[in-house]
Amino acid sequence: MQEDTIIQKNLFAIGNDINEQKKITKIPENLSLEDLKKESQKRPRQRKNSTNLINKFKTDLISNNKNVCINEESYSYKTVSKLKLTPVMKHYVTLKEENKDRLLLYRLGDFFECFFEDAVLISNLLEITLTSKDAGKEIGKIPMAGVPHHAMERYCADLIKKNYSVVICDQLEKSSGNYGTPIKRGITRIITPGTVIEEGMLIAKKNNWISAIYLSEENSDESYEWGISKADVSTGELITLEGQSLSKLFDEIIKLDSSEIIVGSNTARDLLIKGNSQITYTVSQETNFGINEANYLIKNYFQIANLEGIGLKNLNNATRSLGGLLNYLEKINPSNLDKDSSLKISLDFPQIQYGHNKLIIDYQTQKNLEIKNTQRENNYVGSLLWSIDRTYTCMGARCLRRWIDSPLLNVNEIYKRQNIITNFLESKKLRIDTQNLLRAMGDLERLAGRACAGHASPRDLIAIAEGLKKLPRLKSIIELFKYDLPDWTDQLKNIDEGLLELADTISFKLVENPPLNISEGGMIHDGVDNILDGLRNLMDDYSEWLNKEESKERKISKISNLKIQFHKNFGYYISINKSKVNLAPQHWIKRQTLTNEERYITSEIKNKENKIFQIKSRASSKEYEIFCELRNIVAEKTKQIRSIAKSIASLDALLGLSITSVENNFIKPSLIPINDSMTKNSTKIIAGRNPIVEQLLSDKKFVANDISFEDNQKLIILTGPNASGKSCFIRQLGLIQILTQIGSFVPANNAEIKIADRIFTRIGAVDDQSSGQSTFMVEMSETASILNQATSSSLVLLDEIGRGTSTFDGLSIAWSVSEYLAKKIQCNTIFATHYHELNYLKNTNKNIQNFQVLVEQNNDQLIFSHRIVKGGSNKSYGIEAAKLAGVPKEVIEKAKSVLNSLEENNKLNYDIK
């Protein structure tokens, strides 16, 4: 028998050295069960115990150092005795006890370190080395892992993305240089997923919400009362709402799209997890949701006498949630960790979100219409937002996203947005000028937020100044606009002069391209501060001295290419080529030898070096002081900057919609108010198109279709085979409705749109395994929700009902639902169905009309035209569709035979119209 070989050091079956080939016995194949049992007995396998990370650390520590004594208490901050710890570790444990649920990064020299359990955890999360540190004679080694201080933000971003909160303990003073002298350290930052403000931790075009939920203590679904408040700390936006019933709360929670959700107890968290186990909640038991505490916190934070002025009167649940949110933010706010700091998280007055002033789009409808992400892959590309977003700023992109979440009901507000788009469409020059202004505009909302929190860099302030300097040119553009405009345009017409003065102040004090590291200096202009100018003059003198010293040493040594250079570790030194070593004078002191270079120092250079360092240090400190004062000035203008930024964001969103209109031939729709009893007109669209599908069909022409809910015919029965375009058509109507109510133009040749108070969809269904509901039960639950909540002003889009049960049960349910919608609710409805029998409803109800997807049949081949025409289809074409899918011919023939038999026995005696 020949033997197979395992060839080492080579993955491609050719050994580098035949002696390195290790021979093994050929592996037997096709063993029976008995053979496998014998094999198991011949070579029994040993059970391996699971090894957690702490045990692995112990094992590695012992193997690396045989003399280490393992002490169980040294692996957890909870069990270690603080009396036995070194002063530094005692301080670490004290801080960790105050932040049990957060990772603590503790500054030691050039690293931020973690110890005990945190070290083991971050070594795994960040894939960094787990090592050890001596914590005292009686404790011995403890786990340690750390990251370089200059890379701390990048590593924190990774931890935040994994939904961890981080506490930063930094050095509050520089080392004195005396070994053994303790350095003052303290918490300078608490970073949680919902409170990050750093640019690298945020998604530029998306809000980063933190939410707090107050939940009443009730026992039944419908009796639960709740309040939700959510804030974007980076932009200052604050929204609050309240409601009743757990089912509505669960839907709102999914729509929150929050990075962090705060609740006040484990009981509340456990109850909310039942609604959606995929969402993580932060339990903050020290956060108070009491009504009295909330009243005090809100009035104190916003500096108001009562809650009526901000719309919270009699909204106790919303008030409680807002109080809880402010309480939580107060506890983790960096400014509260530094009592002398005047900086804080700055939030706008709360926007009260009522159900009666916005188009309500529940989570299921958002998902079915693929408003912000695709349904199957959860991708941005292929969503409605993707198809219309042509914004130039991050502020504008976030604004457009918010508009899509909450479209308008007020036709006057919609008209005003349309008027901005009309102005842009009527003047290409106006459009291009605005594009050029906004193209390089910084994110003023978040830049101001960083300044307010004390984290803005010099480059952030420069970006703020550059943005504010564009305000006069934006004003001149707005003044050219015609028609009735939104209120926010007044801010751009009447610019706060203080903002322009602020921009000038920043430009006067900061250089155009300041360094990234603010401790290096070089960020403040000359002529800003007399003391700084004096220090810089001295530095220039010493620089001139160094040049003269370099010339002098060249003459003494006769080395023409000699240079005096600087190294951050060695200071100033004389550098010469190694070939010139024999020319080095005796007063030179050798400092370092490199491959092609020799480095020396002299007593004169060393003497001057100390003085240069002192002056540089004083100059850098002075620059930092001037910069911090400037940053505080900017922080005081945070609300004004953010307010003007929101106006710019709205302008950008509408500019983007105008560009979308130009690119895709959108038109301005006419509007019918929601409570207009003077007209019987309803939604009518000529040559409407699906904005998403049309853009995805790059090589094909989209087939446009008409739709009309006229003459009180509120319900449309839409029939046609699979893949013919029914789902695309009903989604198309929903998308056009949303576009209309955000103020956009729409993809059609002509459109008259009745404003809707809510959009309901029931499109497709799958098992809900988490709640144990079958496909049919999910479908029926969604249908029940629509029938119980829809009003005559709603838009209902149904794609199949009754598929998960028997044919006659399903048909009966679909029939009854259709009649209920047409007769009782009387809202605009499209019902796409395979039950062509539903076409007969038109004969019994004047509120119902039939439409079908036109299909041509040629020699048993289906040809889809994707055209929607009046009249019902008398065939479902299911067998033909099965044939197209590749079902065997024998099955197809049998299906035809069965169908003929069923149709003869169950034929309804009506003519389809």
Curated annotation (Swiss-Prot):
<dbReference type="GO" id="GO:0140664">
    <property type="term" value="F:ATP-dependent DNA damage sensor activity"/>
</dbReference>
<dbReference type="InterPro" id="IPR045076">
    <property type="entry name" value="MutS"/>
</dbReference>
<dbReference type="GO" id="GO:0030983">
    <property type="term" value="F:mismatched DNA binding"/>
</dbReference>
<dbReference type="InterPro" id="IPR016151">
    <property type="entry name" value="DNA_mismatch_repair_MutS_N"/>
</dbReference>
<keyword id="KW-0067">ATP-binding</keyword>
<dbReference type="GO" id="GO:0006298">
    <property type="term" value="P:mismatch repair"/>
</dbReference>
<protein>
    <recommendedName>
        <fullName>DNA mismatch repair protein MutS</fullName>
    </recommendedName>
</protein>
<keyword id="KW-0227">DNA damage</keyword>
<dbReference type="InterPro" id="IPR007861">
    <property type="entry name" value="DNA_mismatch_repair_MutS_clamp"/>
</dbReference>
<keyword id="KW-0547">Nucleotide-binding</keyword>
<dbReference type="Pfam" id="PF00488">
    <property type="entry name" value="MutS_V"/>
</dbReference>
<dbReference type="GO" id="GO:0005829">
    <property type="term" value="C:cytosol"/>
</dbReference>
<dbReference type="Pfam" id="PF01624">
    <property type="entry name" value="MutS_I"/>
</dbReference>
<dbReference type="InterPro" id="IPR005748">
    <property type="entry name" value="DNA_mismatch_repair_MutS"/>
</dbReference>
<keyword id="KW-0234">DNA repair</keyword>
<dbReference type="InterPro" id="IPR036678">
    <property type="entry name" value="MutS_con_dom_sf"/>
</dbReference>
<dbReference type="Pfam" id="PF05192">
    <property type="entry name" value="MutS_III"/>
</dbReference>
<dbReference type="GO" id="GO:0003684">
    <property type="term" value="F:damaged DNA binding"/>
</dbReference>
<comment type="function">
    <text>This protein is involved in the repair of mismatches in DNA. It is possible that it carries out the mismatch recognition step. This protein has a weak ATPase activity.</text>
</comment>
<dbReference type="Pfam" id="PF05188">
    <property type="entry name" value="MutS_II"/>
</dbReference>
<dbReference type="InterPro" id="IPR036187">
    <property type="entry name" value="DNA_mismatch_repair_MutS_sf"/>
</dbReference>
<comment type="similarity">
    <text>Belongs to the DNA mismatch repair MutS family.</text>
</comment>
<feature type="binding site">
    <location>
        <begin position="720"/>
        <end position="727"/>
    </location>
    <ligand>
        <name>ATP</name>
    </ligand>
</feature>
<dbReference type="InterPro" id="IPR007696">
    <property type="entry name" value="DNA_mismatch_repair_MutS_core"/>
</dbReference>
<keyword id="KW-0238">DNA-binding</keyword>
<dbReference type="InterPro" id="IPR017261">
    <property type="entry name" value="DNA_mismatch_repair_MutS/MSH"/>
</dbReference>
<dbReference type="InterPro" id="IPR027417">
    <property type="entry name" value="P-loop_NTPase"/>
</dbReference>
<dbReference type="GO" id="GO:0005524">
    <property type="term" value="F:ATP binding"/>
</dbReference>
<dbReference type="InterPro" id="IPR000432">
    <property type="entry name" value="DNA_mismatch_repair_MutS_C"/>
</dbReference>
<dbReference type="InterPro" id="IPR007695">
    <property type="entry name" value="DNA_mismatch_repair_MutS-lik_N"/>
</dbReference>
<dbReference type="InterPro" id="IPR007860">
    <property type="entry name" value="DNA_mmatch_repair_MutS_con_dom"/>
</dbReference>
<dbReference type="Pfam" id="PF05190">
    <property type="entry name" value="MutS_IV"/>
</dbReference>
